[in-house]
Regions:
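C-terminal motif of bacterial Sec signal peptides marking the signal peptidase cleavage site
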Residues: 7-10
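Mid-length scaffold segments of soluble, non-membrane domains
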Residues: 99-148
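Glycine-centered loop-to-beta-strand initiation motif
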Residues: 155-163, 169, 173
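Short, acidic Ser/Thr/Gly-rich low-complexity loop/linker segments typical of extracellular
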Residues: 144-158
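A short, solvent-exposed loop/turn motif at the edges and junctions
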Residues: 175-184
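Extracellular beta-sheet/turn segments enriched in Thr/Pro/Gly and aliphatic residues
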Residues: 96-98, 104-111, 190-203
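N-terminal export leaders
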Residues: 1-2
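N-terminal low-complexity, Pro/Thr-rich disordered segments
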Residues: 13-54
Length: 203
């Protein structure tokens, strides 16, 4: 096939128990004020303001960080997407857990030759092979076959594209690039479900 991989780098936040702020069981729509275990007692706004994220809600923060060019990605900020929370920490010891309400965020990096293991997506460190490539994406309910998403997505400079999917479901997702395709099962039903998909090898 004609695809040429641009680069491949690992994801430092690839395990279900990866280091980062402790998940907060409260998802009432407000950010946690103060640090979680191990962090300094900094208010919510301090971390966000320090990284140019003040005034954004959780969804906007995720989409903003996902879309940054590689040069723009902060080296001193970790942002881990969990099924119900965005866990953030920085080099100053500030930690923050923001609730993700409504739809489930899944970030996907199709690949041809090389990939890396990942489970919970790291918005600032995860990199996939195919950057800024158009991908035909189809997501259907695994039980009924109902198509819930179909269209063209473009991978960001980090090689990933993100989808907001209905929470609580089981789906089949197909990705196609230049005639090469892959189909896999995905789930948005539990707190253990992956938010990072790096196993779709296009053939």
């Amino acid at each position: 096939m004609a695809l040429a991989p641009l680069f491949l780098a690992g994801c430092r936040n690839d395990e279900p128990d990866a280091a980062g702020p402790t998940p907060d069981s409260s998802t009432d729509g407000t950010a946690t004020d103060g640090a979680t275990s191990g962090g300094s007692q900094a208010g919510t706004g301090d971390l966000l303001a320090a990284h140019g994220l003040e005034g954004m809600d959780t969804r906007e923060i995720i989409e903003h960080l996902e879309a940054l060019t590689l040069d723009e990605r902060p080296q001193d900020l970790m942002a881990s997407v969990r099924p119900s929370q965005l866990l953030m920490s920085d080099a100053e010891g500030r930690e923050l857990a923001l609730p993700i309400e409504g739809d489930f965020y899944l970030s996907t990096a199709p690949f041809v030759e090389g990939t890396h293991e990942c489970w919970f997506h790291s918005l600032t460190t995860c990199r996939g092979e195919l950057a800024e490539v158009e991908v035909e994406v189809r997501v259907a309910d695994a039980s009924t076959g109902e198509v819930i998403h179909e269209g063209t997505e473009r991978t960001h400079p980090n090689g990933f594209f993100g989808l907001w999917l209905p929470r609580g479901g089981s789906y089949e997702m197909t990705c196609t690039v230049d005639g090469a395709t892959y189909t896999t099962a995905i789930s948005t039903a539990t707190e253990d479900d992956a938010t990072c998909l790096t196993t779709m090898q296009l053939t």
